[in-house]
Curated annotation (Swiss-Prot):
The gene is infB. Residues 449-452 are annotated as: G3. It is found in: Cytoplasm. Residues 428-432 are annotated as: G2. It comes from Shewanella woodyi (strain ATCC 51908 / MS32). GO terms for molecular function: GTP binding; GTPase activity; guanosine tetraphosphate binding; translation initiation factor activity. This is Translation initiation factor IF-2. One of the essential components for the initiation of protein synthesis. Protects formylmethionyl-tRNA from spontaneous hydrolysis and promotes its binding to the 30S ribosomal subunits. Also involved in the hydrolysis of GTP during the formation of the 70S ribosomal complex.
Length: 894
């Protein structure tokens, strides 16, 4: 390797040779221009220059800062406030200078050497001192031995004479005799004291044992802690009283006391008690503590005794009770009940309402005795207060006509009643329960006509519950349908006999045998086939078989032996209810027993009232209605729910109390069912914000239609779109409904009702979407369409063209240009593309240029050649395929 001289190094670094020689000299290296430079010298010069210009490679000082933010909850009264706490930490690291480190290491080394030398010198000195001490000790021992020998010799020389020894012995004997006398006297005194102590112990042993027992009990039960002033004062009084009792006990008078000495009286002892109390207070730091001598108090134990066992109480629990109320009854904290409920697997809050069974389990689990209270005692008393000793009489059968929609139920009833009801129904389908009674030659029959539409399940269930016989209408040309099967299930669930009316027998395509065969698959067997169900072939249009059907109904009723109390207080069931604008709440009641009269007090579910007017199914006013008679009653406090029991009571005030109690109970039960803390609801709430909601304000003419519409609309809800009925009711659309719909961005839906003038003004000013319907089909279909508009759209990619690369050209401006032949569809300049090689997508992007010959074009059709430049992609090869596609939005529907 060639040597590097100073001149050559100066040429490489771009400096003059003289300047480089000076820098070498400053770095402590003596060089001339012709001298060679080694790598070590180069490195030494470089380090010198770095230090001189402050260009060290690594920083000598580094500061790290750390900041953490936390939240502290601070309670202020009943509220809590979150305070942010920010903690900042700063730490600085300093890198020492290598020269300083070397100096420090040298100094430390010198210090260690000096320390080692000092330790060696100290050790040598200690060894010398120990050796000197050992020599001095040996010398002292030798001197002591010599001195002892000298003393023994001197003693031997000066031994006592015989006379001196005898005198000494006599003195010792006299001293021993004196000691024996003193010892005997002390023994006698000790025996006397022991005898006195034994006598005192025998006299007071029982009392001392009792006091010791009480003291141990106090120590066991009393929890020592800092007491309040009132507790300390009470403890002092107790201690003073005990001290006075002890002082009043008779004691033996001292022998040295004079005969005329004044005896201590109770009064004086009382003063002593006060003095003791004062001394105790002074010891605590009372007002006279500075002027009196401090005396330790006798006792600071307070009078409270800590309970050592669980206090078991009788807990009275009603039908519903909140967690806070239950804790108050058990005299414990609500948190204890919450902990117990968590152990039992249920998450509750302090204000949550528990049902009676749950509260009973919790209370019994915590060791308390439970007393169940029936809060509806007044309700039982009111309903039990009936007219007695009344004989039951035969009554007319209640017949419910059920079947699939458009199978001719209402038309059949029209022919029986000789009236036109079906023509008055919107769309020709029944949307209410119609209650009618018909007088025949053989007796009276009450008919309930139920809707056959799928939405009216609850109505059909109520009809089957309040009926005696079910007539199942099946169209001979249509056969068994879904609502036909549902009607069979309702009849079987209610245990009601079933009569099958095969309708539309006048049609040429009627096939009654097919109907029998299909019904037999669902457990309905004809009497001709050995079953128990009567089959009657009828035609609502021609009247064929109507008389046979009525005879079959009356025959079945005679077999059932239907009886009811005709006189006395009435009871029945609400078949239908609505809110009439002119008449108020109107309820259709089917009387089941007794006689309902105008002026009676009626308790109807959550509502009550006095019957102000009664109308029959034809709209005529009546004053009374017996068993199996349907009537409309006016005068209730509100619209009752269809299916509620209607009962006549004696006292309007008690009826009001029962109605209010039922309303509160209904509200409590509703709250008890809202378990928001359940795990399954937790996951449902996590995706709640992703679901679109269609808000609806719904009003209908009758309660039954309202229930049916609500059930149908709620059934339309999906995972993506939810129907939210924010308000519903019976009656016309009011200004309040319109304001609510405007505030919540809801659709107003009126089913056989209209909006009043004030509501229309709000609807026009707020541009609220208002829709009227009279047929439930149309309502459900339009709501479904509105929900479809809220669905997130789907996007689909459609291939619109395919080109094959035949050759590749290079362009200096664009890059690789693919000469292509369009084999399918059309190549568009604005559409995105994919590059395929061996039918595998290798690139996805967009076109940069599209030319035919030398002209820029927007599209190239099938069978034509073109030049394609792919943006940001140059790896186009012969044989590749360029696929052009576009994204198409597809509207979704439910």
């Amino acid at each position: 390797m060639a040597e590097t001289t100073v001149e050559k190094l100066a040429t490489e670094v771009g400096k003059s040779a003289d300047r480089l020689v000076e820098q070498f000299s400053d770095a402590g290296i003596k060089k001339s221009k012709t001298d060679s430079v080694s790598e070590a010298e180069k490195q030494q010069l470089l380090e010198f220059l770095k230090k001189q210009h402050g260009g060290d490679s690594a920083p000598t000082k580094m500061t790290l800062q750390r900041k953490s933010v936390s939240t502290l909850s601070v309670g202020t009264g009943s509220d809590s406030k979150d305070v942010k706490v920010e903690v900042r930490k700063k730490r600085t690291f300093v890198k020492r200078d290598p020269a300083a480190e070397a100096e420090a290491e040298a100094a430390a080394k010198l210090e260690a050497e000096a320390k080692a030398a000092a330790e060696a010198a100290a050790k040598a000195q200690a060894d010398a001192e120990a050796k000197a001490k050992a020599e001095a000790k040996a010398k002292a021992d030798a001197e002591a031995k010599e001195k002892a020998k000298a003393n023994a010799a001197a003693k031997a020389k000066t031994a006592p004479t015989a006379e001196e020894k005898a005198a000494q012995d006599e003195a010792d004997r006299l001293q021993a005799a004196k000691d024996d006398v003193a010892k005997a006297k002390a023994d006698e005194e000790a025996k006397a004291a022991a005898e006195a102590a034994r006598i005192l112990a025998e006299e007071n042993s029982a009392r001392w044992a009792e006091e010791e027992k009480q003291r141990k009990e106090l120590e066991k039960n009393v929890d020592h802690h800092v007491t309040t002033s009132s507790e300390a004062r009470a403890a002092e009084d107790t201690a003073d009283a005990n001290a006075e009792k002890r002082d009043r006990r008779p004691r033996k008078a001292p022998a040295a006391a004079p005969a005329n000495a004044p005896a201590n009286t109770g009064k004086g002892k009382r003063r002593g008690g006060k003095d003791n109390r004062r001394d105790s207070r002074n010891a605590r730091g009372g007002r006279n503590a500075r002027n009196n001598r401090s005396v330790a108090p006798e006792s600071m134990d307070h009078a409270f005794t800590k309970p050592v066992a669980v206090v078991k109480t009788d807990v009275s629990i009603g039908e519903t009770v909140s967690v806070a109320e239950l804790a108050s009854k058990m005299s414990i904290k609500a948190t204890e009940i919450i902990k117990q409920m968590m152990k039992m697997g249920s998450m509750v809050t302090i204000n949550q309402v528990l049902d009676q069974e749950t509260a009973q389990l919790v209370a019994e689990e915590m060791g308390h005795k439970v007393v169940l209270i029936r809060e509806n005692e007044l309700e039982h008393q009111v309903l039990a207060d009936r007219d007695g000793n009344i004989q039951a009489e035969s009554r007319a059968p209640v017949v419910t006509i059920m079947g699939h929609v458009d199978h001719g139920k209402t038309s059949l009833l029209d022919h029986i009643r000789m009236a036109k009801v079906a023509s008055g129904e919107a769309g020709g389908i029944t949307q209410h329960i119609g209650a009618y009674h018909v007088e025949t030659d053989n007796g009276m029959i009450t008919f309930l006509d139920t809707p056959g539409h799928a939405a009216f399940t609850a109505m059909r269930a109520r009809g089957a519950k309040a009926t005696d016989i079910v007539i199942l209408v099946v169209a001979a040309d249509d056969g068994v349908m879904p609502q036909t099967i549902e009607a069979i299930q309702h009849a079987k669930a209610g245990g009601v006999p079933l009569i099958v009316a095969v309708n539309k027998m006048d049609k040429p395509e009627a096939d009654p045998e097919r109907v029998k065969s299909e019904l037999s698959q669902h457990g309905v067997m004809s009497e001709d086939w050995g079953g128990n169900n009567m089959f009657v072939h009828v035609s609502a249009k021609s009247g064929e078989g109507i008389d046979e059907l009525l005879e079959g109904i009356l025959l079945e009723a005679e077999v059932l032996e239907l009886k009811a109390i005709r006189e006395g207080m009435a009871a029945g069931v609400v078949v239908e209810s609505k809110l009439d604008k002119g008449r108020g709440p109107v309820a259709t009641v089917l009387v089941q027993e007794g006689t309902l009269k105008q002026g009676d007090i009626v308790l109807c579910g959550l509502e009550y009232g006095k019957v102000r007017a009664m109308r029959d199914e034809n709209g005529r006013s009546v004053t009374e209605a017996g068993p199996s008679i349907p009537v409309e009653i006016l005068g209730l406090s509100g619209v009752p729910s269809a299916g509620d029991e209607a009962t006549v009571v004696r006292d309007e005030r008690k009826a009001r109390e029962v109605a209010l109690y039922r309303q509160g109970k209904f509200r409590d039960i509703k709250l008890a069912r809202q378990q928001k803390s359940k795990l399954e609801n937790m996951f449902a709430n996590m995706t709640e914000g992703e679901v679109q909601e269609l808000n609806i304000v719904l009003k209908a003419d009758v309660q039954g239609s309202l229930e049916a519409i609500c059930d149908s609309l709620n059934g339309l809800s999906t995972d993506e779109v939810k129907v939210n009925i924010i308000a519903r009711g019976v009656g016309g659309l009011t200004e309040t409904d319109a304001s609510l719909a405007a505030a919540s961005n809801a659709i107003m839906v009126g089913f056989n009702v209209r909006a009043d003038a004030q509501a229309r003004k709000v609807i026009e000013s707020e541009s609220v979407d208002l829709r009227y319907y009279s047929i439930i089909y149309q309502l459900i279909d339009e709501v479904r369409d509105a929900m479809s508009g809220l669905l997130a759209p789907e996007f689909k990619q459609e291939i619109i063209g395919l080109a094959e690369v035949r050759d590749v050209f290079k362009s200096p401006k664009i890059g690789a240009i693919a000469g292509c032949m369009v084999t399918e569809g059309t190549i568009k300049r604005s559409a995105p593309i994919r590059v395929l090689r061996d039918n595998v997508v290798i690139y996805e992007g967009e076109l940069e240029s599209l030319r035919r010959f030398k002209d820029d074009v927007n599209d190239v059709r099938n069978g034509m050649e073109c030049g394609i430049g792919v943006k940001n992609y140059n790896d186009v090869r012969v044989g590749d395929q360029i696929e052009v596609f576009e994204t198409v939005e597809i509207a979704r529907s439910l």
